[in-house]
Amino acid sequence: MPLLDYLASHPLAFVLCTILLGLLVGSFLNVVVHRLPKMMERNWKAEAREALGLEPEPKQATYNLVLPNSACPRCGHEIRPWENIPLVSYLALGGKCSSCKAAIGKRYPLVELATALLSGYVAWHFGFTWQAGAMLLLTWGLLAMSLIDADHQLLPDVLVLPLLWLGLIANHFGLFASLDDALFGAVFGYLSLWSVFWLFKLVTGKEGMGYGDFKLLAMLGAWGGWQILPLTILLSSLVGAILGVIMLRLRNAESGTPIPFGPYLAIAGWIALLWGDQITRTYLQFAGFK
């Protein structure tokens, strides 16, 4: 196809197109982050009522990632297409609803911008390759999972498990690791945090993390192979400890306040996939091993 040939031979055009795509995807991720937990809660309630033998709730209006159309949470004004252009509409509207002038949350444009910038970097890092396409899907998934976990302390299986399988499929073709390394990465990724979970619970009687974290690290191992696991665990622990203390201080929260670990795993895994080899070599040279 002429367009694909053009993008393959013009790296800058590929990066710019990927940034624009990232803006659109970022807008959709805002919808996913807002609606998916509510959709899951609806399903849980329906399943609980069925298990308890209760009458099902009256049929509710359709609620999914497509319907109903997005609306202002304050006045209910339905957002029109020209009011939903990523970043542009937010700036044109001055960050306010066109109807009631209520402030629009700053996180919406920030998510769009972050998705665009990360997507552009992936395109620049990998070039016009299958690796770039796969890494874009992973990046978008990690962003959505991180935000949902930060809001609800929840890592949805509907996001984690498909990405785990996608990582194994990608590495069937050797995009990031061999298939054997990816399989071991998935197994060891799950078992490593599972072991820490039970050891911590035996010692303290408390649950230090959720099962979603096990699955997330297994998913990252399926993408990068078992070799990225030590660096991912180390980076996520360091970043989580530092930011966790800062967040507790800022919120004046108690030390027992739960802190989602998923975002730190996602950040660390993403870094390990892109720069793991360079970070490891630099550390070994600094430590005098090479």
From Swiss-Prot:
Lineage top rank: taxon: Bacteria
Chemical reaction(s) catalysed: Typically cleaves a -Gly-|-Phe- bond to release an N-terminal, basic peptide of 5-8 residues from type IV prepilin, and then N-methylates the new N-terminal amino group, the methyl donor being S-adenosyl-L-methionine
Names of required cofactors: Zn(2+)
Pfam family membership, one: Peptidase_A24
GO terms classed as biological process: methylation; pilus assembly; signal peptide processing; type IV pilus assembly
Organism encoding this protein: Pseudomonas aeruginosa (strain ATCC 15692 / DSM 22644 / CIP 104116 / JCM 14847 / LMG 12228 / 1C / PRS 101 / PAO1)
Protein name in the entry: Prepilin leader peptidase/N-methyltransferase
Localization per Swiss-Prot or TrEMBL: Cell inner membrane
Effect of C72G: About 80% loss of peptidase activity and complete loss of methylase activity
Effect of G95D: Complete loss of methylase activity
